[in-house]
Amino acid sequence: MDRTLESLRHIIAQVLPHRDPALVFKDLNVVSMLQEFWESKQQQKAAFPSEGVVVYESLPAPGPPFVSYVTLPGGSCFGNFQCCLSRAEARRDAAKVALINSLFNELPSRRITKEFIMESVQEAVASTSGTLDDADDPSTSVGAYHYMLESNMGKTMLEFQELMTIFQLLHWNGSLKALRETKCSRQEVISYYSQYSLDEKMRSHMALDWIMKERDSPGIVSQELRMALRQLEEARKAGQELRFYKEKKEILSLALTQICSDPDTSSPSDDQLSLTALCGYH
């Protein structure tokens, strides 16, 4: 722990040279510090040059407790884990969680290396009841994860978050299974989706998937939404990374809104990402 704290102080001294490392997390102006941290990273490494720096979102509420989210360059999302009596307090608390994770992300142990990949694959095998042989088989979920990590060698886990979230969502809504049935390899799927960001276009396509599921299993969207909201709240209160749970909530909310406003909605628009487009790529 002492070594980790010393490493964090060293990182703060490098990225925020005019800040006192001992006072960083006690500074009430943590919102500006988080912004300064990522601006400094962009200047030093040209990281995420085409993206905004830090984006905040406050949930509408008539009164406390208030909830605020902050999304970092690369896609990682964090929220306030404390019970906050004002929107400003919630925003500061979310920024503090994000800053701590941003600093930890600079540690060597958070960079994707061969050793990191080996440890991550072993953890994935343990959590899926698979075997290490699965890591060499790209048709398995562990193999796909292994391939994604190797394709992003040298990046940090926060830089890897956007692509990871996309594949978590594709697995969650059944798209990966559907793509396997069309004979698309995991490598082709990864190469295809690596070109895209998780934006409104992709959310609309995934919402359409759930609209179709609702027709086969009435009530499944509201059931999944309740689960996603519970997962999001539990993860936020635990100070965990939230992007996957938050995107699930956004996609399901969009699907439910469309179902309620137009029960006959079923046709995708031409500009939406679709399985057909990927099969054409294949």
UniProtKB/Swiss-Prot annotation:
PANTHER family: ECTOPIC P GRANULES PROTEIN 5 HOMOLOG (PTHR31139), PROTEIN LIMB EXPRESSION 1 HOMOLOG (PTHR31139:SF5). Belongs to the LIX1 family. This is Protein limb expression 1 homolog. GO terms for cellular component: cytoplasm. Coiled coil: none annotated. InterPro entries: Autophagy-related_EPG5, LIX1. GO terms for biological process: autophagosome maturation. Pfam families: LIX1 (PF14954). It comes from the Eukaryota.
